[in-house]
Amino acid sequence: MAGAIRVTMEVGADGVAVVTICNPPVNALHPIIIQGLKEKYAEAMDRDDVKAIVLTGAGGKFCGGFDINVFTEVHKTGNVSLMPDVSVELVSNLMEAGKKPSVAAIQGLALGGGLELTMGCHARISTPEAQLGLPELTLGIIPGFGGTQRLPRLVGLPKAIEMMLQSKFITAKEGKEGGLVDALCSPDELIKMSRLWALEIANYRKPWIRSLARTDRLGSLSEARSVLNSARQQAKKVAANLPQHQACLDVMEEGVLCGGHAGVLKEAKVFKELVLSPTSKALVHAFFAQRLTTKVPGVTDVQLKPRKIRKVAVIGGGLMGSGIATALLVSNTSVVLKEVNPQFLQRGQKMIAANLEGLVKRGSLTKDKMNKAMSLLKGALDYSDFKDVDMVIEAVIEKIPLKQSIFSDLEKVCPPHCILATNTSTIDLNVVGEKTNSQDRIIGAHFFSPAHIMPLLEIVRTEKTSPQAILDLITVGKMIKKVPVVVGNCTGFAVNRTFFPYTQGSHLLVSIGIDVFRIDRVISSFGMPMGPFQLQDLAGYGVALAVKDIYAAAFGTRNLDSNLVDLMVQNGRQGKSNGKGYYLYEKGGKPKPDPSVQVVIDEYRRCAKTMPGGKPVTLSDQDILEMIFFPVVNEACRVMDENVVIRASDLDIASILGMGFPKFRGGLVFWADTIGAPYIHSKLSKWTEIYGDFFKPSSYLEDRAKRSLPLSAPNATQQASSRSRM
């Protein structure tokens, strides 16, 4: 096996064969690696000069798991035989049942199939901070190399279920406390200690433990069944649409009832079935799509190097500004928070402190790191601290004259290299920077609320934004643990523009007689975090009212003119902010549907006059789902046609991370392609005849439907000067 992907074996004078996985950067289990492991293990078992084996990984990492690229090939071909036999042939027969003991020497990480290999060894030695986990369920599958059987036997059912169903990583130090790791040592001592341990097993001075044969951590049959049943009920609540959760529990139960070997055989069968499931195809697509978002033609492929961003100024300490500042502070970036008066500044600083305390409570930040973050924050009422900032992010209210004035000032007070970013969600960037001469430095940094938690960052460029500014903001996005998606400059950018029909479609359904709370139930059941009306309550009605005229001007006849939000406000309803919207909100309680909102709904229907003959329309749940999401798909087609996004998969990630579109459906465009353009076009055409241009199919969709092409296929007319590539 030539090249970087290989398995090596070195036999020392002590009789220990050190087998090393070499596949940078994380030693993924490519089929070549798996074949190499089989060959080296077979050779070690046959050689008289080998007494024991140490399995490790090159470059300070044990193994990051199975090579996910293989799943893509399986999905393309439908040929599951491309998956090599690892569970039985390698882990069970060659490693665990082998006549010579194996010890896993772990550092860096042992994830997925990597951790499963270690559990096929007879002992595990690790550095304390190594990350251990079985994250397979995030890809729509289950551990397939024996993990569902061995992990419960090493750490007990409750911990194993937690690690697998939540895809939770633990450190090796935690693993030692729980029984997964046998001993901890420094990186310098790892191989030496592992060799000695392997020899002591071979010489019967340490126990020769085959994990699959253990039952002492499983508890009694009744206890195991109780734990599994409880886990099933929990999975139904939190993962109702995800088949891999119940499948994982089924396979674990098989092992408990019928023994480890029977469990391994069932695991292998179910694993192959799940690899070909729609859920796995969608989640694997989303995995690779997220990696692609940072590949930007003309920016990341032209030998530019990102500049160091050490100090950032945030203008505006409201909800968005304080959230953005929080995200920067947590990443150890110095922040200047500017406000217009001491009261607003103090409020912004308090919001940042509250955000940080919230992260501590959630366990994602230590108290020490919180204090360090706060020490990096400086308040300001003028621009005197802007002379050495590397980036400014403006996050004030959506008023054009105010933003123009700020950017005109920034050009005068900031250094020439400073990036001038705006968090606007609706205003044309060319308008924002109209009164400056530094248009190449102006860029959109559109965060989603709450900015320190939501993972998406829309990076908006104009035709004048420099590639360097884009690259720098991509780098900052990654630094603050956001997923950056580069988009073009248009009303609503990619996410808000694509999803503007989402709320409007729900309003149309209400106008023709469909119950508000039924709509929310249908959309939640589909996999959205909440329905459109609960989302409106949470976001507040101010945003909807603020963008109403902007969308009407930009989108013309396909914009639905609805006065439902106006009527809600007139009725004294502001959503969650005043405890009363479509739902009632009590402190600490769950939202409850408010029956009294029907008065507002009735008035809205009278104003809309869209119910045929004044009678409610009868629709199935599928009709409701399609009438809300197909217009969204239709707008996504326009976004792709205008090249607002670089590729369709960027819109998939933006829909998942920005709007909560279910990841297990692969993203908006991926989901639409599973349905097909002809069907979507036919339904939209039918509704256009009944309800008007809100549903009118775009030319892009019409073309794809006529030719039965996927919506995600690259646009043949796409030019290098597309908006997202400017």
UniProtKB/Swiss-Prot annotation:
- A GO BP annotation: fatty acid beta-oxidation
Does the record's keyword annotation contain RNA-binding?
Answer: yes
- Xref: Pfam families: 3HCDH (PF00725), 3HCDH_N (PF02737), ECH_1 (PF00378)
Q: Where in the cell is it found?
A: Peroxisome; Cytoplasm, Cytoskeleton
List keywords of the entry alphabetically: Cytoplasm, Cytoskeleton, Fatty acid metabolism, Isomerase, Lipid metabolism, Lyase, Microtubule, Multifunctional enzyme, NAD, Oxidoreductase, Peroxisome, RNA-binding
- Its EC number is 4.2.1.17, 5.1.2.3, 5.3.3.8, 1.1.1.35
Q: Which domain of life is it from?
A: Eukaryota
GO MF annotation terms:
3-hydroxyacyl-CoA dehydratase activity; 3-hydroxyacyl-CoA dehydrogenase activity; 3-hydroxybutyryl-CoA epimerase activity; delta(3)-delta(2)-enoyl-CoA isomerase activity; enoyl-CoA hydratase activity; microtubule binding; mRNA binding; NAD+ binding
Q: In which pathway does it act?
A: Lipid metabolism; fatty acid beta-oxidation
Catalytic activity line of the entry: a (3S)-3-hydroxyacyl-CoA = a (2E)-enoyl-CoA + H2O; a 4-saturated-(3S)-3-hydroxyacyl-CoA = a (3E)-enoyl-CoA + H2O; a (3Z)-enoyl-CoA = a 4-saturated (2E)-enoyl-CoA; a (3E)-enoyl-CoA = a 4-saturated (2E)-enoyl-CoA
Q: Under the cellular component aspect of Gene Ontology, which terms does the record hold?
A: microtubule; peroxisome
Complex formation: Monomer.
Q: Which PANTHER family match?
A: 3-HYDROXYACYL-COA DEHYROGENASE (PTHR23309), PEROXISOMAL BIFUNCTIONAL ENZYME (PTHR23309:SF49)
Domains (record comment) = The epimerase and isomerase activities are contained in the N-terminal region while the dehydrogenase activity is in the C-terminal region.
Family affiliation: In the N-terminal section; belongs to the enoyl-CoA hydratase/isomerase family. In the central section; belongs to the 3-hydroxyacyl-CoA dehydrogenase family.
Q: What does this protein do?
A: Multifunctional enzyme involved in fatty acid beta-oxidation. Also binds to RNA and microtubules. Possible role in subcellular mRNA localization and RNA-cytoskeleton interactions.
Record-given protein name: Peroxisomal fatty acid beta-oxidation multifunctional protein
